[in-house]
A protein has these predicted regions:
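C-terminal auxiliary extensions adjacent to catalytic cores
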Residues: 2-24, 28-35, 39-42, 47-50, ...
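Residues that scaffold, gate, or flank divalent-cation-dependent active/transport sites
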Residues: 10-44, 48, 52-57, 61-99, ...
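Short secondary-structure transition/capping motifs
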Residues: 28, 32, 66, 70, ...
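Alpha/propeptide regions of enzymes that mature by internal proteolysis
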Residues: 92, 115-117, 218, 307
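FAD-binding glycine-rich core of flavoenzymes that anchor FAD
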Residues: 113-139
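Cysteine-centered functional microenvironments
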Residues: 136-141, 318-322
Length: 492
């Protein structure tokens, strides 16, 4: 059986994607095991002779940090923490994102700076491997002290509480534990805090978004090129000379891709009567490229985050230190997630403008891309749908990270609101995918009005594959199923 070994090697987003998509199981490697054991042993020894309070280990939490807890109550303190912080509400987080949360939490704990028992980490790994996925809710995290409420829901099953997805059903964790022959784990000092304090809710949403944004960004170029051909657009704005004098990486990449995809196109080679195209066509390298550059930057930030220890306090056995600090704060990823939402929203914004041009009865295309307009409305309303989605995404692009509401009697007086940035980002990604699917629906229709001229072999191949599931529309028909099939096509 193929396993991914949890270690201190750099974990890439591409590797995370492979683990999730191929359902690869994980094992805690020797390096990680020893780091976890060493840190736990150090903490146990420290508890016996330390003469001062240690936040979250021998004290209460948040503004209760000045209340010292007797040694005999430390386990109950951690148990209470997990229960009391499970205050999420709203829609459930999709299981594939919760599975990402599990993986990222395991990775973070295995650096050996959190003080958890090896048994605890292995239980999380067992849950991951057996596809026992905790039920987590979208609302409840401020994005500092980490993602407390959602991570509490994720970790409730460890102590035999909460609910899980198992074999297609939502079940009580205690019942599933009984079936598996697992006992609830008795948490030791600091463990509850190590489990709850972290950025894995935000990070998992960010990783999911990046994986899908990369795919959608690629499709934006393909679909935009098909629209350009259908609109009888000019090839000159994509020539390399233009982009050498403004050498943004994403811009150069986009122009190069579009040129490659238009190679040997009869439509592109045909003489044009118009001097230039609207911005939504000729500025694709600049707009799509800016989204690519943003995605590249955000990916680098998130990759650093998923290779980090993000709980508090941080334990350093080699230096004989337990330091209360702020690695749980989500600001380093909240701002980039807001940026990525804006970038992806712009892909849908420019896409909707191309849709509008295609249905406007210009350049030899019939109004609303239907031969017998009047009795037929044709592609009039898909543009309305795209416009409504784009408008929603624009509203969602108000940055979450500019907000902060103090909590815990103002001990936690600045928070990132990164969890809100994360959930908004997921919605914007989904919206962008749908708008691009609607553009494909329109572009494929419009391209056929260019016959007998053909586009490039590449674009014609994409068109042929798409036509296997969505037909040319000759007369008005029920459009919704074709929009949904278009979305499915982009996910293949």
């Amino acid at each position: 059986m193929n396993y991914h070994i949890i270690s201190h090697e750099w974990l890439t987003i591409a590797k995370v994607q492979e683990i999730i998509e191929k359902n690869i199981k994980i094992k805690i490697g020797e390096q990680a095991e020893q780091a976890v054991i060493k840190c736990r042993n150090f903490l146990d020894t420290k508890m016996k002779d330390i003469g001062r309070p240690v936040y979250g280990v021998t004290t209460g939490f948040g503004s209760l940090c000045n209340i010292t807890i007797p040694l005999e109550d430390l386990s109950q303190l951690q148990h209470n923490l997990v229960m009391s912080h499970a205050c999420g509400t709203g829609d459930k987080v999709r299981p594939e994102i919760v599975k990402l949360m599990l993986l990222l939490k395991i990775q973070s704990l295995c650096y050996g700076h959190s003080g958890v028992q090896l048994e605890t980490v292995k239980r999380l790994a067992d849950m991951f491997n057996c596809n026992i996925i905790p039920v987590v809710y979208q609302q409840g995290s401020l994005g500092a002290s980490g993602d407390l409420a959602p991570l509490a829901h994720m970790c409730l099953p460890i102590i035999g509480m909460g609910e899980v997805y198992y074999k297609g059903n939502i079940r009580n964790a205690a019942d599933v534990w009984a079936e598996m022959g697992w006992e609830p784990i008795r948490l030791k000092s600091k463990e509850g805090l190590a489990l709850l304090n972290g950025t894995q809710f935000m990070s998992a949403h960010a990783v999911w978004s990046i994986i899908n944004a990369r795919r959608i960004s690629d499709w934006a170029d393909v679909i935009g090129t098909m629209s350009l051909e259908a609109y009888d657009g000019r090839i000159e704005p994509f020539l390399p000379q233009v982009h050498r004098v403004r050498p943004h990486q994403g811009q150069i990449e986009t122009a190069g891709r579009i040129l490659d995809m238009m190679k040997d196109s009869q439509i592109a080679a045909n003489a044009k009567s118009h001097v230039q195209d609207p911005y939504s066509f000729r500025c694709m390298p600049q707009v799509h490229g800016a989204a690519k550059d943003t995605l590249r930057y955000v990916s680098s930030v998130i990759e650093t985050e998923i290779n980090s220890a993000t709980d508090n306090p941080t334990v350093f056995p080699d230096e004989d230190l337990i330091i209360s600090a702020g690695n749980f704060h989500g600001e380093p990823i909240a701002i980039p997630m807001d940026m990525l939402a804006i970038a992806m929203s712009e892909l849908s914004n420019i896409s909707e403008r191309r849709i509008y041009r295609l249905i406007s009865g210009q350049r030899g295309l019939p109004s609303f891309l239907i031969a017998k307009s009047g009795i037929n409305s044709g592609f009039m309303i898909p543009q309305y749908t795209a416009a409504s989605i784009v408008s929603q995404s624009k509203g969602l692009c108000t940055p979450a990270s500019v907000d902060s509401i103090p909590s815990s009697q103002s001990q936690e007086d600045h928070v990132s609101m990164g969890a809100n940035a994360a959930t908004k980002l997921v919605k914007v990604i989904e919206n962008t995918e749908r708008v691009l699917a609607i553009e494909l629906f329109n572009a494929a229709q419009a391209l056929e009005f260019r016959r007998p001229l053909k586009s490039s072999p590449y674009i014609e191949h994409v068109h042929d594959e798409y036509r296997k599931i969505v037909p040319f529309i000759s007369d008005d028909t029920y459009m919704h199923p074709y929009i949904e099939k278009s979305v499915e096509f982009l996910r293949k």
